[in-house]
Swiss-Prot record:
The lineage of its organism: Bacteria, Pseudomonadati, Pseudomonadota, Gammaproteobacteria, Pasteurellales. This is Outer membrane lipoprotein DolP. A lipid is attached at residue 22 (S-diacylglycerol cysteine). A lipid is attached at residue 22 (N-palmitoyl cysteine). Its main location: membrane. It comes from the Bacteria. Belongs to the lipoprotein DolP family. Pfam families: BON. It is found in: Cell outer membrane.
Amino acid sequence: MTLSPLKKLAILLGATIFLQGCVAAVIGGGAVAAKVATDPRTTGTQIDDETLEFKVENAVEKDAQIKAEGRVNAVSYNGRVLLIGQVPNSDVKDTATALAKGVEGVNEVYNELTVSPKISFAQISKDSWLTTQVKSKMFVDGRVKATDVKVISENGEVFLLGNVTQSQANAAADIASKISGVKKVIKVFKYLD
């Protein structure tokens, strides 16, 4: 059977498109494996923290006012939960703390929610970019291992979590504070010394 040049091109393009999905899956899987392998927490602890984040956000979202008017994200590191986002008033902020503390497995809650309107998608994107820049600078700087510090940004504020020494914490905060667009750096570390 002889294929026309047009059919050969169609088959080649189809195969290329199909294989691109495979490549993305392989690269994505490799990135996840690298993240898990370089994180100082055990794989089990990483899974526990991810599960805890989901459970806390789920518990908080059950409050009707938070669900309707707030934006709450939970970040967990070794069972210590950081709440970030926006809520309509201080009573709702307190409710979020109580709900988070009620989740099994939560050791401590750091409530950094702000009483303000929800941030825009544009700000969320800027925050994602800030996080990327901070992690990149830590990687290049060398005073603190980027894999030892979990970085999250919210409305221009950078939150740093992890188990580090005082000098590593200060170095991480110094690196983050020098990134353009960072309004404030908040350390949520457990100190090893």
